[in-house]
Every structure is written in C-alpha cells, then in structure tokens.
From Swiss-Prot:
It comes from Macaca mulatta (Rhesus macaque). Beta-adrenergic receptors mediate the catecholamine-induced activation of adenylate cyclase through the action of G proteins. The beta-2-adrenergic receptor binds epinephrine with an approximately 30-fold greater affinity than it does norepinephrine. The modification Phosphoserine is found at residues 246, 261-262, 345-346, 355-356. Disulfide bonds join 106-191, 184-190. This is Beta-2 adrenergic receptor. Pfam families: 7tm_1. The chain crosses the membrane at residues 35-58, 72-95, 107-129, 151-174, 197-220, 275-298, 306-329. GO terms for cellular component: apical plasma membrane; ciliary basal body; early endosome; Golgi apparatus; intercellular bridge; mitotic spindle; neuronal dense core vesicle; nucleus. Palmitoylated; may reduce accessibility of Ser-345 and Ser-346 by anchoring Cys-341 to the plasma membrane. Agonist stimulation promotes depalmitoylation and further allows Ser-345 and Ser-346 phosphorylation. Phosphorylated by PKA and BARK upon agonist stimulation, which mediates homologous desensitization of the receptor. PKA-mediated phosphorylation seems to facilitate phosphorylation by BARK.
C-alpha cells in the first residue's frame, strides 16, 4: 500500500547529509540503490515464479483440481498480481525516490494494492469455512460446495474486493484535507498515500480485521474438531487392538484397513496444518502493518515513516511465501518437480488426474493417492449411532472418500 507522508523522500535510504565528502555520499547512495534493487528484483522474481508454478500445476494436473485448490488458485492469482503490478512499482518508487508514472497510475496502483490484500484475506476466510464444512459435515460437503459453486464464490470475493478497493480510491473518498496532502495530490511526482482518518479505519476493518476475525474463529473450530477426531482415532485403534486381536490374526486385511483409515485421517489433519501455516503466515506478515495503519492516522508522528514502509514490504514478501508452504504437500511437491523437469516419469496429466509412484513408472495405479481406489479397503466412517471408525468393504473412488467418511476428506490435495 502507499506510503504515508513524504515517503519517497527518505525510503530507508542511507542518510548522507552529514557526510564530509560528497563523493563518498554519492557512492553510498549508488551502492544502496544497487543493493536494494537486487533484493527487490529477487522478491519480485520469487513472487511471480512461485505463483505461476502453483497456478500451472493446478491447471495441468487434474488430481490437483479440487474445490479447496480452486481457492488456492484464487489466492495465487492475488499474489501474482501483487508481484506483477504492485511490488515492481513500489520498488521503483523507493529506488527513484519519486513517482514517475503520473497521478492516474498512482491511484490505480494503490487500488490494485488494496485489491490484492483484500482478495487474499477474504479467500483465506473462505478456505477456513470450506475446511470447516469438510471436516464437520463430510456427508453433505460434496453437494454443499461443488466446483461450480466454488467458482461463483471466487467471483464474488473478487467483486467485493474490487468494490471495497477501487471505489473509495477512484471516487477520492480516501483523501485527507491538510495542506501537505493537497500538495501531494496535485504533484505528478508524488504518490504518498495520504488518507483521512475515517477511510483508514473503515478500510482496515472491512478489508482486513473482519475477515481476520472470521478466519481465526472458524479455523479454531476446525482444529478443535480435528483434535476431537484424532482422539477418536486413538480410542478406536486401542479398542480394536484390545478386543479384536484374534480376528486380526485371522484376517490381516482388517488390521491393514484400519491402519490405512487412520493414515487417511492423519493426512487430512496434516492438510489442515498446512492451511493453518498459510493463514498464520499471512496474519503475521500483514497484521503489524494494519495496526500501524490505524495508529498512524490517529497519531501522525507516533510511528516513524521508515517503520511504516518496512512493514508494508513485509506484507509484500508474504506473496512469495505460499508456494514454499505448498511444498509440504506431496501432491504439489511432485507436481512442481515434474513442471521443473526435476522428476522424470513421476506424474502424468490424464483424464482422471495423474498417477505417482516411488519407482517412477507413470500410468500405474500405485502411489499413496491411487491406493484409495483398490478393492476391499476400509474407510474412516462416523456412522450414525456409533462412536467408532468402522470398516466398509468395496470399491470407492478417491474423490468420494470425503463424502463417505466423517473425518477423512481426501478431496484436499494439500495432504
């Protein structure tokens, strides 16, 4: 987001006004510009490359095209737009110590900045709600949230984000009335984001704090449910081993099925942890900035401008973190390796997804996901009237597991 005050005048550059030698000062300034230019270029490259990789992986491999990963795609698009249309111009603003793109692009650039942050936090909020229904109502989940409904939700997120970001800025509702702000608005070379108090507080609440509170509340409920289900798994396994040891010895398949059931459940909870890391990282990166954003308009001189800009860039850097976090998922990790030609014959884009295995043979129905489609396997179920996870024989497609079992939703590729 834009810098408050005369941000382009200092922008964390070394203060050479007290240097005794002009040449030394100039050399320091040039070294600072080169160093910061390299760092900012690497940040832009990481954001763009990582999120293009995520979007391409989901688009290419059908196994990754789940409802949750549709929302992940929306999140990656917001980060990609941030890396292409926001961060480079912010870097140029800092390095050139002035704005060279005109008043129109200044406001448009600021609007895109607010749009990306708002779309990201709202998408994370939607993901939290998605996981809540997936783990608490798996029988209804697939009919409740289809891929078409997910597309509509994503569209609504971007429409709402666009209205809350572009409308107030393009209509100039954000503008402050003090003389320094008026002078900046009139100058083509000034793009410091002076705002009035009402806009700063209202936009922070609507675009960040409300979605954040919803996200934290819902995801805390999700983790409570996940913890309860893990305790149920432990109890069920203990009861199984205590009461049915002789049956297991007669039919090893039953024991293997229960172990596999628990494995699927644990993978679902690992997916929840991955999404929790994504949400936590976003919160840690952006919360300090939004706190300072409100404090700044209430007490102008309390927060140094350097701190404001630094926290703004911490938020920018968050856009490059998510692709690294997705590497926790074997699905994404294998897909990334395939796209980067680091893994030979390990993935295959096909009509029903892709297959993966440890020996590198494509097309084989092995690998940890396609095992779910074998005959006579046991699923985790929380059937009405029972407190245990019980076995169920038959062939069940992997895409339907989350509608068959209480706590084993494998429709999430962040496993």
């Amino acid at each position: 987001m834009g810098q408050p005050g005369n941000g382009s005048a200092f922008l964390l550059a070394p203060n050479g006004s007290h240097a005794p030698d002009h040449d030394v000062t100039q050399e320091r300034d040039e070294a600072w510009v080169v160093g910061m230019g390299i760092v900012m270029s690497l940040i832009v490259l990481a954001i763009v490359f990582g999120n293009v990789l995520v979007i391409t992986a989901i688009a290419k491999f059908e196994r990754l095209q789940t409802v949750t990963n549709y929302f992940i795609t929306s999140l990656a698009c917001a980060d990609l737009v941030m890396g292409l249309a926001v961060v480079p111009f912010g870097a140029a603003h800092i390095l050139m110590k002035m704005w060279t793109f005109g008043n129109f692009w200044c406001e448009f650039w600021t609007s895109i900045d607010v749009l990306c942050v708002t779309a990201s936090i709202e998408t994370l909020c939607v993901i939290a709600v998605d996981r809540y229904f997936a783990i608490t109502s798996p029988f209804k989940y697939q009919s409740l949230l289809t891929k078409n409904k997910a597309r509509v939700i994503i569209l609504m997120v971007w429409i709402v984000s666009g209205l809350t970001s572009f409308l107030p800025i393009q209509m100039h509702w954000y503008r402050a009335t003090h003389q320094e702000a008026i002078n900046c608005y009139a100058k083509e070379t000034c793009c410091d984001f002076f705002t009035n108090q009402a806009y700063a507080i209202a936009s922070s609440i609507v675009s960040f704090y409300v979605p954040l509170v919803i996200m934290v509340f819902v995801y805390s409920r999700v983790f409570q449910e996940a913890k309860r289900q893990l305790q149920k798994i432990d109890k069920s396994e203990g009861r199984f081993h205590a009461q049915n040891l002789s049956q297991v010895e007669q039919d090893g398949r039953t024991g293997h099925g229960l172990r596999r059931s628990s494995k699927f459940c644990l993978k679902e909870h690992k997916a929840l942890k991955t999404l929790g890391i994504i949400m936590g990282t976003f919160t840690l990166c952006w919360l300090p900035f939004f706190i300072v954003n409100i404090v700044h308009v209430i007490q102008d001189n309390l927060i140094p401008k350097e701190v404001y800009i630094l926290l703004n860039w911490v938020g920018y850097v968050n856009s490059g973190f998510n692709p690294l976090i997705y590497c926790r998922s074997p699905d994404f990790r294998i897909a990334f390796q395939e796209l980067l030609c680091l893994r030979r014959s390990s993935l295959k884009a096909c009509g029903n997804g892709y297959s993966s295995n440890s020996n590198g043979n494509t097309g084989e129905q092995s690998g940890y996901h396609l095992e779910q489609e074998k005959e006579n396997k046991l699923l985790c179920e929380d059937l009405p009237g029972t407190e245990d996870f019980v076995g169920h024989q038959g062939t069940v497609p992997s895409d339907n597991i989350d509608s068959q079992g209480r706590s084993c939703s494998t429709n999430d590729s962040l496993l």
